[in-house]
């Protein structure tokens, strides 16, 4: 258990912005930070990075105060029931010669963010984030397999209290992970082929994150991240015309504006520069509409001759980091196909779930992903479990192969606390909600080969 308090003081002048963090919240400490931020703003003006941008371009004062409170139906400060639940989960499987390791855990993070501009309260937001975790590893005849329920990237993360645990439905997850791991250790390896690929929502989380979310970050497109996190195959001239995916692909920035996503992991009322968070489409039936860029990044793009729209995604990981363009809740709209429809549509292919490994180039284009669990499908029927399934592709063409999108019965609201970006590094919470999806003519292989 840890606590942290502090403030990030921002100074804005014409053609310049400066940030200075302090844990000293006394008037003297805040004044010292303000003086430092102002000096840095003068330095950035001399770099020309914000040339021709006025104070209002850089930071516009909102006309209202934004408030957010994680929607919690019932929560108690008594954590004994949570501890009892975790202990019961840990005791749900018995130690055997095959069981190598197991773990079950739950992390709760409570935070409050306030924004003041020119002495006026702009935003007061309170969040409760829950992050459960379950893993079991077995070794059978020299073959080791690990199964996460909650996933390698903890995709069950949501906002909420006791109600969030009920929505996650994780009771019995450790026993399920143990059973899956045993079955995987005895299963054949994934076949090497080109064929249909069905991705379940917890793997769609990683696919969305790496090959839609990161490439669309506007500061990356502007070149800010090339020294650390890389660039993007997306360029400013693509917005409004480029066909990013098939007509089945609609992707939106959703800061929790719908009942289904109200408790998604990165829901909020405004970003950390005071911009109102609104539901906006990023990709509309395959066509690239707008980037993942905050107001300041959009103004910089305008000065280059590209009048792109912005979303409220200027986010900081904490009081000691400046806001930068980040993913928040990046979601794919459901389609009309049931899970049975998806399976029946496949002549030969593999269904994959739960990411275990990932690799993608620094322009977020060529990628390779490995999953924990796969099912081979032939003639519209599931044939059986396969282990070490993997697939590879190219973002610029992969989403064009999207041929079917699952309906709301296949839709899951997920999230991860593990998005890293920025110098110095910032770890951000992001949400990804998606149905199951089918892709055609994908290169499939065994990651153990």
Residue ranges and their predicted role:
Residues 1-7, 99-123, 344-370:
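Structured beta-strand/loop patches that form or line metal/cofactor-binding pockets in enzymes
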Residues 32-125, 160-202, 341:
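Acidic low-complexity segments
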Residues 198-210, 275:
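Extracytoplasmic assembly/pore-lining segments of large envelope/extracellular complexes
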Residues 80-165, 200, 219-252:
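Extended amphipathic alpha-helical scaffolds
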Residues 1-42:
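N-terminal alpha-helical targeting/anchoring segments
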Residues 29, 227-230, 234-449:
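Dual-mode signal for accessory low-complexity, basic/Gly-rich regions
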Residues 110-128, 144-152, 207-213, 262-266, ...:
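Short acidic, glycine/serine/threonine-rich loops at helix termini
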């Amino acid at each position: 258990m840890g606590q942290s308090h502090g403030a990030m003081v921002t100074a804005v002048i014409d053609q310049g912005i400066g940030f200075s963090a302090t844990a000293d919240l006394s008037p003297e400490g805040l004044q010292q930070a303000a003086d430092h931020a102002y000096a840095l703003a003068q330095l950035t003006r001399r770099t020309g990075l914000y040339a021709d941008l006025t104070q209002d371009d850089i930071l516009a004062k909102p006309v209202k105060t934004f408030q957010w409170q994680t929607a919690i139906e019932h929560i108690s400060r008594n954590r004994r029931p949570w501890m009892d639940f975790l202990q019961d989960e840990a005791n749900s499987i018995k130690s055997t010669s095959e069981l190598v390791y197991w773990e079950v855990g739950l992390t709760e993070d409570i935070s409050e963010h306030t924004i003041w501009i020119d002495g006026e309260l702009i935003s007061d937001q309170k969040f409760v984030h829950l992050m459960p975790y379950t893993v079991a590893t077995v070794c059978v005849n020299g073959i080791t397999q690990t199964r996460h329920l909650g996933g390698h990237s903890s995709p069950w993360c949501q906002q909420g209290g006791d109600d969030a645990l009920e929505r996650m439905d994780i009771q019995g997850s450790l026993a399920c992970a143990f059973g899956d791991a045993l079955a995987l250790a005895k299963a054949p390896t994934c076949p090497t082929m080109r064929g249909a690929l069905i991705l379940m929502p917890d793997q769609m989380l990683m696919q969305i994150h790496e090959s839609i979310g990161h490439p669309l970050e506007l500061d990356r497109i502007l070149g800010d991240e090339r020294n650390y996190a890389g660039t993007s195959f997306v360029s400013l001239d693509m917005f409004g015309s480029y066909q990013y995916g098939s007509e089945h692909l609609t992707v939106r920035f959703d800061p929790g504006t719908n009942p289904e996503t109200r408790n998604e992991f990165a829901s909020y009322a405004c970003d950390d520069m005071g911009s109102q968070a609104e539901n906006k489409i990023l990709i509309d039936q395959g066509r690239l509409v707008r980037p993942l860029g905050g107001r300041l990044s959009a103004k910089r793009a305008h000065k280059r001759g590209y009048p792109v729209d912005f979303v409220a995604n200027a986010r900081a990981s904490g009081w000691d980091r400046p806001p930068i363009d980040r993913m928040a809740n990046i979601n794919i709209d459901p389609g009309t196909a049931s899970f049975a429809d998806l399976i029946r549509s496949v002549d030969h292919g593999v269904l994959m779930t739960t990411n275990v490994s990932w690799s993608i180039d620094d322009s977020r284009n060529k990628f390779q992903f490995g999953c924990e669990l796969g099912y081979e499908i032939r003639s519209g029927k599931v044939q059986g479990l396969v282990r070490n399934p993997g697939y590879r592709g190219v973002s610029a063409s992969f989403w064009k192969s999207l041929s079917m999108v699952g309906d709301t019965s296949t839709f899951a609201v997920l999230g991860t606390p593990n998005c890293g970006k920025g110098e110095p590094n910032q770890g951000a919470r992001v949400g990804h909600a998606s149905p199951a999806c089918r892709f055609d003519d994908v290169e499939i292989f065994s990651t153990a080969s």
